[in-house]
């Protein structure tokens, strides 16, 4: 039994495209979801004056979630995207005059100098995480159903997808569209609904 946790949507920066692409490409199951408040810390491996900072490193989502604070307080420092906030902490150790945006856990783990706490632009900054796995879990009354539907890029395609849900009064909480990476003339629609997968209504939609 293997499970993983991946970010899918942030309240400030929106959808995490890499996660949607992976959901489309891989044969995995969504087993649950959770929302977490996200707080960002400004640190560096070696202490120096903030005015001397040349680079600010972090994951693109973290850079985006702190962009207004960075514009106001460190407008001259170059922003460098890393694959994770942990990689940003490591870069700060190897690259002089480099700040990193990381979690409070990373500040402690990597023994970083802590300049400022909670530098995210929104005090309500939160991220929705999906719990993914390779097994089906038992259903509950609070379950949702997530659909991935691919359709040709033609007038009325989205209406045809949504009409059966409307007919059966199935509430859709979220719709995201992404270009298909398999065809230039197709799009993928990621849909979250409040109905259970194995109810008759949901089964009808899956088959239609």
List the model feature ranges, each with a label.
Residues 1-200:
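Domain-level signature for soluble enzymes in the chorismate/prephenate branch of the shikimate pathway
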Residues 198-208:
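Single conserved hydrophobic/aromatic residue that forms the stacking wall/gate
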